[in-house]
């Protein structure tokens, strides 16, 4: 026989999400104390989460088709699975207006789909009396898609921002999950972006973009630039950037993931070597975001800060406004790896992590 095992598998299932707090349909209250006139009065205190009587069960429907094949005396085994998982009535603790007296409320916010293929290969290339080598390889391809967002179409319905990192994620109907959303880093302002005034100061050239509503006279060489994608201009026709220039700048979801495991056995000894890999995903580097910038007194920074842009002339110990001198102090100032004032959610902190 060619096959030691040949099996076709088809499965369907549905399940809820049990990782949700209890009784979120009800609004809870606590007690507090209020002193007045020398007396202590007991009052009620609202909780943090407002109940939602319209909550529905979150439900995931799973369809799976698989094929298992074993040959060569089961020394080579291959498993292939195709799956399609659809989650509806997703339950998320959403922020709500403070005017309600609460901060959050569990809501059914939408539906998503995860579809993909998983391949597992197990083999025993060598098997002798004293020595055995067995190897396992797996690779998985997953594609997510937001199928629906319930009850809204404004940006606040699909834009989530982490407070600590200030990195935004855009959740958009018809698009995959994991989209990084922010400004596109465009390097630093260099001396070529400015004109030297007769009094020794400098000013930003016309046509060079700046932050909307920010005084162009305050922009300095070494400040960070972002791309003005929306076409907005100021009163003088100069391009400006703002929150309207945010766009998708990466995706945290990999194109595929996998692993390779090898076990070598010799008599009573064994050695296992394994590796995992992820290809095509972007990573937000919070260390770059947190430890790069001009406002880091009395704390450590990353080594990249040693190559930061400087406005201080070491000959005088003071800030210089002479553009020629600044160019001398900052050779390669147009190199995108130089930095000084990095803030906000932007593409500088996003990198390919394959």
State where each predicted segment sits.
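Outer/extracellular conduits and scaffolds centered on Gram-negative outer-membrane beta-barrels
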Residues: 1-33, 47-49, 53-354
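Charged, low-complexity intrinsically disordered boundary/linker segments
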Residues: 36-40
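Catalytic-core segments of enzymes that bind and process phosphorylated/nucleotide-bearing substrates
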Residues: 41-42, 52
């Amino acid at each position: 026989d060619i096959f030691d095992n040949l099996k076709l598998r088809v499965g369907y299932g549905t399940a809820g999400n049990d990782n949700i707090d209890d009784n979120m349909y009800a609004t809870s209250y606590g007690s507090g104390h209020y002193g007045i006139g020398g007396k202590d009065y007991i009052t009620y205190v609202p909780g943090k989460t407002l109940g939602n009587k319209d909550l529905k069960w979150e439900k995931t429907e799973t369809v799976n088709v698989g094929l298992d094949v074993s040959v060569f005396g089961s020394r080579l085994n291959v498993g292939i699975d195709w799956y399609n998982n659809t989650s509806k009535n997703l339950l998320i603790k959403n922020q709500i207006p403070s005017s309600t007296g609460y901060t959050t409320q569990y809501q059914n916010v939408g539906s998503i789909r995860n579809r993909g293929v998983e391949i597992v290969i197990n083999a025993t290339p060598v098997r002798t009396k004293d020595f055995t080598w067995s190897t396992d390889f797996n690779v998985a391809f997953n594609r997510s898609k937001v199928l629906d967002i319930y009850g809204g179409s404004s940006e606040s319905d699909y834009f989530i921002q982490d407070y600590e990192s200030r990195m935004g994620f855009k959740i958009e109907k018809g698009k995959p999950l994991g989209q990084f959303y922010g400004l596109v880093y465009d390097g630093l302002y260099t001396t070529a972006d400015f004109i030297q005034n007769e009094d020794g100061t400098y000013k930003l050239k016309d046509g060079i973009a700046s932050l909307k509503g920010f005084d162009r006279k305050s922009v300095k060489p070494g400040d960070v630039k972002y791309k003005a994608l929306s076409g907005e201009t100021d009163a003088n026709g100069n391009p400006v950037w703002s929150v309207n220039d945010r766009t998708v700048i990466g995706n945290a979801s990999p194109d595929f993931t996998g692993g390779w495991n090898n076990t070598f056995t010799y008599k009573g000894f064994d050695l296992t070597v394994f590796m995992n890999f992820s290809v095509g995903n972007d990573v937000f580097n919070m260390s770059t975001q947190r430890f790069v910038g001009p406002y880091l007194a009395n704390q450590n920074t990353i080594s990249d800060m040693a190559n930061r842009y400087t406005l201080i002339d070491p000959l005088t110990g003071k800030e210089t406004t002479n553009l020629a001198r600044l160019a001398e102090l900052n050779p390669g100032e147009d190199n995108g790896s130089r930095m000084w004032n990095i803030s906000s959610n932007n593409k500088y902190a996003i990198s390919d992590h394959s």
